[in-house]
Amino acid sequence: MRVSAVLVVGLLAVTAGCGRTAPPETHAPSHPPTATKLTAAPVSPDARVGALFLGAGDLHTCTAGVLDSTDGNLILTAAHCVAGGVDTTFVAGFKDTADPADIWRVDAVYLDPRWVASQDPLADFAILRVEHDGAGTLEDGAGGGLTIGTAPKPGTVVNVTGYGLGVGGGPVGCRSQTELAPGGFPSLPCGGLVDGTSGAPWTTGPTITGLTGGLDGGGCDENVSYSPPFDDGVVALLARAEAGGPGDEAPTVFDDDC
């Protein structure tokens, strides 16, 4: 399991004062993966990927990707990463600390009707509209956004970048080949994608083809991650978010089978 927003709310008071030393940076492998067991490693921040913070503290709880959108202020994450009535902020390319000017407030949450109705893991994705007091858009500051694609076919090589649950630190990354789990969920064999990496985008070039979430909130075993299969639902969700209408109230209950 990759820690739902509902569970994290109860941890905020306990962990907000905890610190973490950032491990040395590496870079995602430049060659296709082999049969050798893969493990995520620290990577340099990507300005198109950032950390989500729930509550007023410094604890980052999930990951999100900056989207290429009409207004430039939309991000994509897992639906189980958001909870109703909880202030949420986002920092693109987060590393160790954040300048106040780089902190974006979540202004609206857009959810698939299947998630709102029953927390269907096939619809475990959310688009968030963000705002801040400065000039320019989030997408401009990130140097561009990621486009939403379709679910990867088995054997597709993808990169995943995410932030483990904690205070400070930086991202980890992995490059691996996707597989297909029962129920139609894309899966990604790679160790070290721990709690907090929910919402981490699975990318092929500038295209997001999945995100850590879906089956069992992204997986009960950190050696295998899952994604909700990107379908017409995520495309429709982007269109609704770009239209700028009112968002949805995120459910306050989420459970998995872990």
Q: Can you say where each PLM-predicted feature lies in the sequence?
A:
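Protease-domain processing segments flanking chymotrypsin-fold serine proteases, especially trypsin-like
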Residues: 2-69, 230, 236-258
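Sequence contexts marking disulfide-bonded cysteines in secreted/extracellular proteins
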Residues: 17-19, 63, 80-82, 173-175, ...
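Conserved catalytic-core segment of clan PA serine endopeptidases
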Residues: 35-47, 56, 88-135
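Catalytic histidine site
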Residues: 42-95, 177-182, 213-214, 258
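Loop/turn elements at helix/coil->beta-strand transitions in domains of secreted/extracellular proteins
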Residues: 47, 71-73, 154-157, 207-208
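Solvent-exposed loop/turn segments at secondary-structure junctions
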Residues: 58, 71, 81-83, 96-98, ...
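Chymotrypsin/trypsin-fold serine protease catalytic domain
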Residues: 121-196
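Catalytic nucleophile loop of clan PA
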Residues: 192-222
